[in-house]
Amino acid sequence: MPLPYIYSLQHCPYAMRARLGLLMAQQKVMVRAITLNNKPAEMLALSKKGTVPILVITNEEGAGLTIIDESLDIMLWALKISDPHNLLHKDTPTELDDMLALIKKNDDEFISVLEKYKHASRYYDFSQLYYRRQCEGFIAQLEETLQENDYFFGATASLADYALLPFVRQFARVDRKWYLQTPYPKLRDWLKRHLQQGVFTKAMAKFPMWTDNHEDYLLGSSIKG
């Protein structure tokens, strides 16, 4: 049976989230790298959403395809099959609901103001400073969560840590000089630890465009050239 494959964009935070989940679950998945201005017809035919990530799984005995086109669902699919780092904290199953609640707050509330903070020049109602302060409500909550532990749900990383990582990284990159002197030292340490991990380097590997050669590449491998 062929390996699953994922349509992915290198710097898309949702695709990044999905790739991190797949790598942490040690799932063998092939990557089809795309660009937003040249979406392959094959991808668009699979999901009405028309954006990455899209994971395609061949069902047993070739009985059709399973399509997963939400980044968190891709993480959960992979980790429910294999969770070698215990990101779901199976010993305390009630924590999963808390993780999902934190991720939902990130996705439903933080990301929308983060986008405005990143692209403040497109929004004429308020300044970048205004949107940054809107972001800081959630950022301060994360800082408070990290006061007693290195990760959001204890001494070890969880699903929530990896699901939020791409978006906290984006926040930190908007105005790095300001970010480095903010009163969020625990969150800075948290982000630094994640960015220094080998899995993050693998998740950010650049692959040739699938539309150029129609070749798939194994997630986690490196392409030289």
What are these regions (language model features)?
Residues 81-85, 174, 197:
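Phosphate/oxyanion-binding loops and surfaces in catalytic or ligand/nucleic-acid-binding neighborhoods
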Residues 77, 174, 203:
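Residues that scaffold the ATP/ADP-binding catalytic core of kinase and kinase-like folds
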Residues 86-91, 114, 152-155, 201-205:
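Short, hydrophobic secondary-structure boundary micro-motifs
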Residues 98, 102-196:
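GST-like fold's C-terminal all-alpha helical module
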